[in-house]
Amino acid sequence: MTDYRIEAPPILRDFLTYHETIQGHSKKTVDEYFLDLRTFFRYIKIEKGRVPRSTALDEITISDVDLELIRSVTLTDIYAFLSFLSRDRAKHANDPSTRYGLEVSSRARKAAAIRSFYKYLVNKAKILDENPIQELDSPKIRQALPRYLTLDESIQLLESVDGDNAERDYCIITLFLNCGLRISELVGLNISDIREDRLRVLGKGNKERIVYLNAACQNAIEDWLEVRRQSGPADPNALFITRRHKRITKDGVHYMLKQRFTAAGLDSSKYSAHKLRHTAATLMLQNGVDVRTLQEVLGHEHLNTTQIYTHVDSDSLRDAARSNPLGSVKVKRRGRPKKQAES
């Protein structure tokens, strides 16, 4: 696995170490911070004349980024960088046929990384006296309603699971639909994570949470473990394994789900493991689970991330309109004075 910190200047390396050791962020999250800041400082080196403007962005080193360059950054520089990302940055750097302009979510993530870095320099490292980008506004992300399966479609999917690996696949789908797990959380599950009706889940940023298992989940796990025990020597820890007795991978789960969606008569291009997580969240909300409890179940750090699931379908909106007590009241209206005809 690549250790990007080798490329980082000391001041940036300290920031990355802080996030991993003090904030407890995962290596993946810290690596993303580095990659976003590397792109930013490559751009800044061009704009500040540290390298010739003709230099390819991806060939610029940031190992020489110093405090002088960091201090020289202004709010205007940040907005110019975000504009560059939206218009001129290749979506896929190594693909000659790629289109240009990053999605708003990618631009917002880079803005968040820059904001976090400068906040660290002021509040934690005490290297800067004031934050030059304190007033930075992030690109607005349009929150699209998540796609999800209806209750009937969920049952249809579960009922269609048969054939090879049926117990394993049924158990995986059941956990997605009932517990709202992320795919990375599911493939990382170990047998030792199961404690009666509780499941220990390692989520984003290496944060642990406990998910309680209902009867459907407990039965599915029991059936799968019985089959797993009979399959011969296997990874002693992994809950879900392949035919080769290795821990199942995210790609393996994606492939399996694609096959299972198709077999159930569902459009496999529209649904995925994450859509099953959306489904679990939606069904729980529709059946009385409050948003804060759902936040804990899903492992969301911020409540506003969970609130995207508070969408309601058109039938619910229609029922809400009908339930308004004024909806059936016939109001006797006073007659309006007739408008005099113009002469």
Give the role of each language-model region.
Residues 1-343:
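Conserved catalytic core of the tyrosine transesterase superfamily
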